[in-house]
Every structure is written in structure tokens, then in C-alpha cells.
Amino acid sequence: MRRCAWAVRALSHMDSSMCSSAPDPEMWIIQGTLAWRTSPVRTGFETKPLLRRIDGAIQVRSNVDPTFYSLVGSGRSGGDPHGSSLLENPYIPYQCMDSYLSSTGLGSASMGK
């Protein structure tokens, strides 16, 4: 099993049309852990490893309001290994986060599936 831990800072008080605009002073701390299991898959005459995400959780805290805490999803299984793209794109505005996570299979809407 391979584990990747990541932390990102995201901006709040922005609508999705402002996703690439100037930063807002309030920052949200978003942290999470993703775990993968590598399984061999036979395709034709060769066996290839298959990355399969077996767990994903996102923790959201605010540096302005210490009482704010949210945990989005955990224990999601799936065959999409692209959740690792969060590691490659660490700065995502808060209002854009759910749509970004949905595109990687980690959004709150896809966690219940």
C-alpha cells in the first residue's frame, strides 16, 4: 500500500468565477491523506500494475475561526488513480475545491457512491 499525505491552502469568500483572482485575506487549511493499493492486472499477454485508490479524506480548518472544522468523506474505494493530481496542484481556491475534487473522484457528492 502506498500512502501520500498532502496539505493545501485554499481561499475562502470567492465564487467560482473568481477562482484565478487575487487572494482573500482569510485562508483555509485543507489537509488530507490518500492511500493506494497496487494490484497486478492481466491485459492480454502481459500483467500490469493497477493503482486503485482505497481511501481518501479531506480535513478543512480555518485560520480565522479556530472552531471551524469539517471532514469531507473517508473510506471511498474506486478505480480512478487521478486523485494524486492534488499533490501536483496544491493551491486551489476554497469555492473551487468541491468541483476540483469531483473531477478527481474525491468530491463530497462522489464520496457517497
UniProtKB/Swiss-Prot annotation:
Q: Does the keyword Chloroplast apply?
A: yes
The listed locations are: Plastid, Chloroplast
The record's comment on protein family reads: Belongs to the ycf68 family.
UniProt GO cellular component terms: chloroplast
Chief location bin: plastid
Query: Matching Pfam families, A to Z?
Result: DUF2647
Give the record's keywords alphabetically: Chloroplast, Plastid
Q: What is this protein called?
A: Uncharacterized protein ycf68
Q: Which gene encodes it?
A: ycf68-1
